[in-house]
C-alpha cells in the first residue's frame, strides 16, 4: 500500500513538473499596430501569437485610430495563454487603420510583402513619441493642445524631440489623431495664396519704393516666390514678408536668410 501511494505521489510530481508553465508563451508588441476591419485582435497587436488566439478580439476601432490601455491588453493576452512583460512600461497602445496582423494586403506587390515580413520581425523598443491629440486638416496650424507624448514601439526618423519644433507650423496634409508627429507632416504656415494681390516693397539706404503685384504661387514667410507686376506684367522674384506683403532687394535677402533654419527644419 505504501509503495502504491509513493508511486502515485511520484506520478503527480512528474506530471506537475512536465506541465507547461502558467506564465504562458512570451510575445512582443508589434512596431506598427494596425488593423483593417475595426476588430483589434491579439494578432494585430503582438508578434508570436498564432492559431485561434490570433483572432481573439481585444477592442473595436470606431474611428481612424483607437487608444488601448496597456494593462487591459496585457490581461487579454494572459487569458489567451500569452505573456507580454511590457518591460518598457508602455501605458497606452495606439492602433491605427491599416492592415490586419501587421502584414500587407493581398493585393500588395511581392516586394512589399517581403518588406512587411522583415519589419514584423525587427527588434522592438518602446519610446516616448510626440503624437497628435486630435485630427488636423491640411493647412491647419498646430497648437500646443494638439500634441501629446505617448509610448510607442518606435518613432519616425524625423520625429521632433521638442513640441516647440512643430507648434505654429501648418499641416501639409490631413493628419490623424494618434499618429506620430514627423517634421515632414508640417511646414511654415502660408501667408500668401496664389492669385493674391500684394504690396511689394524695396528698401535700401533710406530709399523706400512699393508697387502692386499678383502672387503667382503660394508662399510662407521667408519663401521666395514669383510675383507679376500688375502694370508691366513682368514676373519678378520676391520674398514673402506677411499676409499681402513681399519684399525685394537687401531687405528680402535678410528676411530669407533668417527664415532658412525654420524652413530647413520643416522639410
Swiss-Prot record:
<feature type="signal peptide">
    <location>
        <begin position="1"/>
        <end position="29"/>
    </location>
</feature>
<dbReference type="GO" id="GO:0009425">
    <property type="term" value="C:bacterial-type flagellum basal body"/>
</dbReference>
<protein>
    <recommendedName>
        <fullName>Distal basal body ring component protein</fullName>
    </recommendedName>
</protein>
<dbReference type="Pfam" id="PF13144">
    <property type="entry name" value="ChapFlgA"/>
</dbReference>
<keyword id="KW-0732">Signal</keyword>
<dbReference type="InterPro" id="IPR039246">
    <property type="entry name" value="Flagellar_FlgA"/>
</dbReference>
<dbReference type="InterPro" id="IPR013974">
    <property type="entry name" value="SAF"/>
</dbReference>
<comment type="subunit">
    <text>FlaD is a subunit of the flagellar transenvelope basal body.</text>
</comment>
<keyword id="KW-0574">Periplasm</keyword>
<dbReference type="GO" id="GO:0042597">
    <property type="term" value="C:periplasmic space"/>
</dbReference>
<comment type="function">
    <text>FlaD might be the structural protein of the distal basal body ring P, or it is necessary for the assembly of the P ring.</text>
</comment>
<keyword id="KW-0975">Bacterial flagellum</keyword>
<dbReference type="InterPro" id="IPR017585">
    <property type="entry name" value="Flag_basal_body_FlgA_C"/>
</dbReference>
<dbReference type="GO" id="GO:0044780">
    <property type="term" value="P:bacterial-type flagellum assembly"/>
</dbReference>
Amino acid at each position: 500500500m505504501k509503495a502504491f501511494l509513493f508511486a502515485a505521489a511520484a506520478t503527480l510530481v512528474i506530471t506537475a513538473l512536465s506541465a507547461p508553465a502558467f506564465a504562458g508563451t512570451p510575445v512582443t508588441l508589434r512596431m506598427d499596430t494596425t488593423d483593417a476591419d475595426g476588430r483589434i485582435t491579439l494578432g494585430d497587436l503582438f508578434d508570436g501569437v498564432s492559431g485561434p488566439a490570433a483572432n481573439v478580439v481585444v477592442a473595436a476601432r470606431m474611428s481612424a485610430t483607437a487608444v488601448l490601455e496597456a494593462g487591459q491588453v496585457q490581461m487579454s493576452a494572459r487569458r489567451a495563454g500569452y505573456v507580454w512583460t511590457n518591460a518598457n512600461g508602455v501605458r497606452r497602445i495606439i492602433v491605427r487603420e491599416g492592415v490586419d496582423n501587421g502584414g500587407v494586403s493581398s493585393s500588395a506587390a511581392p516586394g512589399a510583402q517581403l518588406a512587411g515580413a522583415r519589419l514584423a520581425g525587427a527588434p522592438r523598443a518602446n519610446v516616448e513619441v510626440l503624437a497628435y491629440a486630435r485630427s488636423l486638416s491640411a493647412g491647419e496650424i498646430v497648437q500646443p493642445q494638439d500634441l501629446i507624448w505617448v509610448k510607442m514601439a518606435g518613432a519616425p526618423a524625423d520625429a521632433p524631440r521638442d513640441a516647440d519644433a512643430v507648434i505654429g507650423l501648418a499641416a501639409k496634409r490631413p493628419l490623424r489623431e494618434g499618429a506620430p508627429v514627423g517634421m515632414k507632416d508640417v511646414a511654415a504656415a502660408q501667408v500668401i495664396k496664389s492669385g493674391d494681390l500684394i504690396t511689394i516693397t524695396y528698401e535700401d539706404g533710406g530709399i523706400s519704393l512699393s508697387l502692386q503685384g499678383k502672387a503667382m504661387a503660394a508662399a510662407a514667410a521667408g519663401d521666395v516666390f514669383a510675383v507679376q507686376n500688375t502694370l508691366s506684367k513682368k514676373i519678378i522674384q520676391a520674398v514673402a514678408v506677411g499676409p499681402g506683403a513681399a519684399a525685394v532687394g537687401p531687405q528680402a535677402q535678410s528676411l530669407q536668410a533668417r527664415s532658412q533654419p525654420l524652413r530647413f527644419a520643416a522639410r
